[in-house]
Curated annotation (Swiss-Prot):
The chain crosses the membrane at residues 565-585, 620-640, 650-670, 707-727, 735-755, 837-857. It is a multi-pass membrane protein. Belongs to the chitin synthase family. Class III subfamily. Disruption phenotype: Results in significantly reduced chitin synthase activities but does not obviously affect cell morphology, growth rates, chitin contents, or virulence. If it does not affect virulence when solely disrupted, the virulence is drastically reduced in a mouse model of acute infection in a doucble CHS2-CHS3 disruptant. Leads to increased expression of the other chitin synthase genes for compensation. Residues 1-59 are annotated as: Disordered. The lineage of its organism: Eukaryota, Fungi, Dikarya, Ascomycota, Pezizomycotina. The keyword Transcription does not apply. It comes from Exophiala dermatitidis (strain ATCC 34100 / CBS 525.76 / NIH/UT8656) (Black yeast). Residues 23-34 have a biased composition (Basic and acidic residues). It comes from the Eukaryota. This is Chitin synthase 3. Residues 36-45 have a biased composition (Polar residues). It catalyses: [(1->4)-N-acetyl-beta-D-glucosaminyl](n) + UDP-N-acetyl-alpha-D-glucosamine = [(1->4)-N-acetyl-beta-D-glucosaminyl](n+1) + UDP + H(+). One of its GO terms (cellular component) is cell septum.
Amino acid sequence: MASQYPGHQLDDIPSTNVYRPPPRHEDDEAEHALLHQNSAYQSQYDDPHSRPLTPGQESVYTLNESYVGGDPSKVPVTSYNPQYTQPYGQGYGMNNSRPGFPTPGPPDPIDRTDSTEAWRERQAPGFGTIKRYATRKVKLVQGSVLSIDYPVPSAIQNAIQAKYRNDLEGGSEEFTHMRYTAATCDPDDFTLKNGYNLRPAMYNRHTELLIAITYYNEDKVLTARTLHGVMQNIRDIVNLKKSEFWNKGGPAWQKIVVCLVFDGIDPCDKNTLDVLATIGVYQDGVMKKDVDGKETVAHIFEYTTQLSVTANQQLIRPNDNDATSLPPAQMIFCLKQKNSKKINSHRWLFNAFGRILNPEVCILLDAGTKPGSKSLMALWQAFYNDKDLGGACGEIHAMLGPGGVFGRKLLNPLVAAQNFEYKISNILDKPLESSFGYVSVLPGAFSAYRFRAIMGRPLEQYFHGDHTLSKRLGKKGIEGMNIFKKNMFLAEDRILCFELVAKAGSKWHLSYVKASKAETDVPEGAPEFIGQRRRWLNGSFAASIYSLMHFSRMYKSGHNLIRMFFLHIQMIYNIVSVLLSWFSLASFWLTTKVLMDLVGQPSTSNDNSAFPFGNTATPIINTILQYLYLAFLLLQFILALGNRPKGSKVAYIISFCLFGLIQLYVIVLSMYLVVRAFTTKNGTDIVTNEGANEFVKSFFASTGPGIVIIALAATFGLYFVASFLYMDPWHMFTSFAQYLLLMPSFINILMIYAFSNWHDVSWGTKGSDKADVLPSAQTKKDEKSKTAVVEEVDKPQADIDSQFEATVRRALAPYKPPEEKEEKTLEDSYKNFRTRLVATWIFSNALLAVAITSDSLDRFGFTVR
């Protein structure tokens, strides 16, 4: 590919010694990758001590990059233009002790991948060198807004296809420079009036689709998975041949903006920043912690890129003659200085960026959620074809690993149960609610809204949960709320859904789009699963009560009579659901006890014997299991009120196993009852010769098979029939059994823990000490123009490129999951001792009471006939 930026290109350097993980079908784009297997070239990045000739060592990079020609005899000695080599005499120069030189020194901050401290050191202007750079004067916008353009590395510039690079709009720098803005204001004040702007608006482009990715602390694999999935979906839209919309009024890619909002510097994974730097959206050493003493609230980077990194650390670049090349994507990267929660991230998205870009549709994604092929286009089409559609969501399914619907993660019963939950929700719940026009929850991990539909009261109510507005809102803010309302905002997406449908004078409705799919990671361990469901259960319960209490606001909306009729039906359905959920604890216990009593103590009016251990042993075993059930139910309250899940991991795992075993026993008993109903005389004594009325009476009698058939059809048949009608039945064979076994735990463990920790709303912000390492921006009066300017380091292109080499190495290095420390804290040990003491005290006294008050001589409450 011809280049107008000499010196540095992304050249292919294949190597046979390079290890490449097994390709995954969703990420494998071999035609674009910079890696080919049949070549003898040696990587120019590898350390001399880790080359194949060194015993016991092996290069594990999935991609090799070069910024010089493909001559394997050359080593990556960084060269500079003469005017930058040693501008201040022989005592100054590059301190090159990185791989590729004869004697590598200790790793310096530019190369280290596993050190947050290394990232801190890289934030200093001119890091990695002791040279003195020239400076340039940057004028502040309206005297207060710091916005600077920085040249991107030559390799990134050269990766842009010529047809885009040569079609610049009036000197546009979107492919050659990254724009950095230090936002020192609240999101509500990020306006054109205050001097803030964004590139798509500066280029007078209409934004049809704003794709937002919210991030907290996900690793680079999860982030790359989401971002690459978005890039592939943008390609699907750009490649549309017969579109009535996208191919008119300018290129399709100019109507799409991708916005990444990172919730704080402190929790952010610094390796993820290297991935963003590799595609040009971020650079080390440019952020300012304050401007003239006014603290920076958010660091905003803008760049239009054609590069992407896959989940297995493979860099994808475009090819000129390939229709499957990724098109340009307009990127906005907002890195908040402090951790201020997801609602605040959405305030930056909607109130700051949304008001400037004014998009038609906003799609929300969580980092780690990968949209499927053409999924984003399917969501957008739903809005395009329905002018009254205010919000929509697609199908979210659990990530099961290699093997697709038969992935190896299904071996974990917790993952399998969650997979079944997701599938049944997408088959039964979401379509039903969509037919009514009100989907109670559009998951924040994968949903879309029409921007003008949520403007006004829906967003105002939604942002009451932002703790950064607590002082401004007073009693209406998060600090003035009672504990019920605070829990309500743990399920903030439900609040937005209700406010959107109930918006006064409007007739917006919500929908489920089956054609749009996305996959997401689910918790694989008991402690993580319990912690996640605490927030979900408490938030959804509070939000459900809120929507029922404020249903009268629907009468102020613009919905027609038919829609209002179905909304009333849905209200009744929601009331029943809340009641069933409220009494589910007793329901499971009663079901377990009644089934055990029916089978273990059969009526004397028939000849049936106790099943499965006979008339003597079965009642004893049933009583033991019932006492164990109640004992572990009580234990859940003790654990939930005094311990955190990670500190009581073993106790929770044992609880999951015990409730699963009891549920398995109950399922066996229920199957026995079904067989007995159809095989015994009393069970099949149906009147068939005295008319339809007598037939129905005998069929649905207490001893008839009708009740059993209805129970089976409602429990098992509905799931099977609906799954086959949706042409997606595989979860019934891979996950249904695990779900049945874990169903009691979902109630007895998760709900007890959630309600017992109703007080935990977790609104506090974490520290942000990482911002302390950032330099400040101090303005000076320009002698000529008398305006406020900031002196900024002006790095030569050669130095930018040399530092980019190390960035690519860090970004494409194989991901090493951090080792989770299982050591319990001192506080955990104290709480565990307290739990064991209280449990031993309660259960020993209960055992004594049962033994003494038992009517029979069997001191454990057994009643043997």
